[in-house]
Amino acid sequence: MSSVGTAEPDGDQRDRQVSKLIFFLFVFGAVLLCVGVLISIFGYQACQYKPLSHCSMVLKIAGPSCAVMGLGTVILARSRARLQLRERQRQGHQDPDQSFFCGESRQFAQCLIFGFLFLTSGMLISILGIWVPGCGSDWAQEPLNETNSGEGEPQICSFLSLQIMGPLIVLVGLCFFVVAHVKKKSNLSSSRDTSEIEGGHTHSTEPVHITVGDSVIIFPPPPPPYFAESSAAAPSPGANSLHRIENPPSYSSLFNLSRTPTPENQGAASERDREVIYTISGPGSSSESSHTGHLPLDLPPRYEEKETAPATPLGAPSESSPP
């Protein structure tokens, strides 16, 4: 018993540690992915307006490397999470991710962090596309002919690709927030359903509020259950009597109730004796009938003996009557 009791907490603790590791891998991979995308965009967009010798190769190498490492970490964490979920479903254990962080599930926290990272990255990319780089001599392209140089049209020095990509990444971050909200609602509904299934017979003392249009109708709380379940769970002093009522005595035992009266059945026995007294009819006196009311069930033979006994003295004077 003790080994089984200690094995279950160890298994739950191991599952929680694995969940924390998966959460860390998800967050670390998402951060690497966002940083790699930012470095790659900034490096390649900045280097396309400069000669290759003046552009740093670190940005071109570090950006894609970080993005690939982050994507691989996210895929690894996702596969490990699926394996853990299948193992828990096979063993029938409870999900430790339901209250992972501040009472929220792990998926909800992951979606929040992903949304925040993508939202921040999209805003940074949009800022880079609008204000960086400025209009300088190094970034200005050479005019193709002399006629165009005379025209005083302002040059657009911002990156059009960054201006398009930034809002798209912000939109992806907002989608992650929506997914987090949906995850929270689904977790609340599932926990409510499980609580209703486990304690479906619990009595609620709160009034019921129903909204119809602009008005709110308040109904009183439902009445308590007619038959309490506690009486069935805990044996009460009257449980034996209830059991006796549910299982009536045998038919043959009904004839022996008058012979061995109990304190509980004395009233019923007296009533039954009175019924026997008033239903018996015969030539005997009332004292005899009252006396025979308490006799056993073999009463008819004794009545016959009493009837034959007074018949003999009646016949004797008839014989001696003639002189």
UniProtKB/Swiss-Prot annotation:
Compositional bias segments (type: Polar residues): 251-268
Keywords of the record: Membrane, Transmembrane, Transmembrane helix
Transmembrane segments: 22-42, 57-77, 112-132, 159-179
Extent of Low complexity compositional bias: 281-290
Stretches the record annotates as Disordered: 251-323
CC annotations in GO: membrane
Tree of life domain: Eukaryota
Annotated compartments: Membrane
Intrachain disulfide bonds: none
Bilayer topology term: Multi-pass membrane protein
InterPro entries, A to Z: TMEM171
Main location: membrane
Descriptive protein name: Transmembrane protein 171
